[in-house]
Regions:
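Asp-box/BNR beta-propeller loop motif
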Residues: 18-32, 59-77, 112-132, 180-192, ...
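Surface-exposed loop and turn segments in beta-propeller and other repeat-based domains
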Residues: 28-32, 75-78, 127-154, 193-223, ...
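Beta-strand-rich domains and repeat architectures in extracellular enzymes and scaffolds
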Residues: 29-61
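Residue-level detector of Asp-centered blade-edge/turn motifs that repeat once per structural unit
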Residues: 47-49, 89-91, 165-167, 234-237, ...
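Blade-level signature of beta-propeller repeat domains, shared across WD40, Kelch, NHL, RCC1
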Residues: 371-420
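Glycine-centered coil/turn sites that cap beta-strands in beta-rich domains
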Residues: 415-424, 428-450, 503
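Glycine-centered tight-turn motifs at strand-turn-strand junctions
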Residues: 458-488, 499-505
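C-terminal tail/sorting-segment detector
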Residues: 492-513
């Protein structure tokens, strides 16, 4: 019997596939609106007017009404069961890059599965395969030069981390596949030639002798970290910024000529050469980069900021592994793997966010790993959207530091209706997580929640005659402990929700230590 319960419960678990950060190397859909994105692992956020694009471990989520409802694209003939690693929007077209892990000889290898784009707000999609090279594509004409180029013939370690747009060109950063561009909506792709590790700048009229390749091997001995693509930005100046494992490359002629900035070639340099993100503050046009330690002994993790396009840099938040930035009229926000930070003085001073708590739902964000940021501001609303490994968060920015209202959007993988319930994550481990019991009432009432073991013995009363509102999603939590505060043993447990205005609700929770 216990084995049967285990199978039923495991079938409801939502995948939590996190986008890796290392550099080792046309069909119609009909979608119902959901209350939240389908996954709690949020890797990318982009906002265009009232539209919010969210890349998750369970496909793409789109809101066309500022986050009030969501259309989720996952487990269908277009997105299948792929995760989304990058999102973009240009001239009415929505773009999403997809990926997954493949197990090779016992190791999980990040593998690209291409792009999807829609010109009609997600009603129809075009699928673009992951760009790879023909084995014979071993050279590139660059100005007066014929550059040797390692053909990238596999999708493994070749997945799209970022998307940018320049005029009618789509640019992608594809990890081991480098930086690529397309001028025909992804039908064909060309490799972008960046400086090798031993050169700080290149232009087509230079006489050059190097290979475009990220790793050494049978093709040649060169292994250029600057040919591993991670991040992209098209700034308001029209300059293109390309972040790699070897620094920040800047082009002022549409991606033809490049100047490279790294930790060693400037008097006031970036902190590290592994560039996970590049963003522009739209208010003062400053450039912000998530600059991680790569291979240099003196490199360090930090945020690097430039007021002059990259000629010199200021370094902030030393030691933090930042993944994204958000900008409001009064503040700069940084999302790191160990916290969320706000600065009101252009980066000189940073303040960590307090424990994030949704007062209305009575839930606390169960992670410190922040992945993505985007802001929405107009005369009536100032909103910071936050992607984490524990859900999507909407923060209504307040008048002082972290004084606003938090709204945590947790996905359960199922839609809730009146007088229904669901527990997640399920299974869960009390030493690292809490079990969220999500339910809704048809009307206001008092609620009691009890936990029972497999023999129907009372383990803990989680809630006793607590007042709860009707017609909204409610979440209360069980920490996996009994009335004495001891962590319970492995096994199946049952919850019972009694209400003053309806029939009891029941469900199962599997505890695994």
């Amino acid at each position: 019997m216990k084995k049967l319960f285990f199978i039923l419960l495991v079938a409801s678990v939502i995948s939590a596939q996190k986008l890796p950060t290392d550099f080792d190397l046309t069909n119609r859909l009909s979608k119902m609106d959901d209350a939240t994105p389908l996954s709690n692992v949020i890797e990318r956020i982009s906002i265009i007017g009232d539209t919010i694009l969210v890349g998750t471990s369970n496909g793409l989520s789109i809101s066309f009404d500022k986050g009030d409802s969501w259309k989720n694209f996952f487990n269908d003939e277009i997105f299948r069961n792929e995760s989304v690693s990058a999102v973009g929007y240009d001239k009415g077209v929505i773009w999403a890059a997809t990926w997954h892990f493949e197990n090779i000889a016992g190791s999980d290898i990040a593998t690209g599965s291409g792009l999807r784009y829609s010109k009609d707000k997600g009603k129809t999609w075009t699928i673009i395969p992951q760009p790879i090279d023909d084995p014979a594509d071993s050279s590139i004409v660059y100005g007066i030069n014929n550059i040797r180029a390692l053909p990238v013939t596999t999708e493994k370690q070749n997945f799209i981390r970022d998307i940018a747009f320049y005029n009618n060109t789509v640019l992608i950063a594809t990890n081991a596949g480098g930086i690529r561009r397309s001028i025909d909506e992804g039908k064909t792709w060309q490799r972008v030639v960046l400086p090798p590790d031993n050169l700080d700048r290149i232009k087509p009229t230079d006489t050059l002798s190097f290979s475009l390749q990220p790793v050494a091997g049978a093709f040649g001995k060169e292994a250029n970290l600057n040919h591993i693509g991670f991040s992209l930005l098209t700034a308001s100046t029209g300059w293109i910024y390309a972040g790699t494992a070897g620094g920040i490359n800047v082009s002022d002629d549409g991606g033809i000529s490049w100047v490279k900035f790294n930790h060693l070639n400037q008097e006031e340099p970036i902190s590290g050469n592994h560039i996970l993100a590049i963003e522009e503050n739209p208010l003062d046009k400053s450039i912000w980069a998530a600059t991680w330690k790569a291979e240099g002994a003196s490199e360090f993790w930090a945020v690097s900021q430039s007021n002059n396009g990259g000629i010199s840099w200021n370094n902030f938040l030393e030691g933090e592994r930042v993944l994204d930035f958000g900008f409001s009229k009064n503040s700069i926000y940084s999302a790191s793997q160990d916290g969320l930070f706000q600065s009101t003085d252009k980066g000189l001073t940073w303040y960590a966010a307090p424990q994030i708590s949704d007062i209305e739902k009575r839930i606390i964000l169960d992670t410190k790993n922040f992945r993505a940021l985007a802001t929405y501001e107009n005369s009536a609303n100032n909103i910071l959207w936050i992607g984490t490994l524990g859900g999507l968060v909407k923060y209504e920015i307040g008048n002082s530091l972290w004084s606003g209202k938090w709204n945590i959007l947790l996905s359960t993988g199922t839609a809730s209706t009146a007088n229904s319930s669901f527990a997640f994550p399920n299974p869960f481990s009390p030493d690292s997580k809490k079990s969220n019991i999500k339910y809704s009432l048809s009307k206001d009432g008092d609620v009691t929640i009890r936990i029972f073991d497999f023999g129907m013995n009372l383990v803990k009363t989680v809630l006793q005659n607590a007042s709860r509102r009707g017609n909204i999603d409610l979440i209360d939590t069980w920490d996996g402990r009994d009335e004495s505060g001891r962590i319970v043993s492995n096994g199946v447990y049952f919850y019972q929700i009694e209400t003053s205005g309806g029939d009891p609700m029941y469900g199962k929770i599997l505890v695994i230590l």
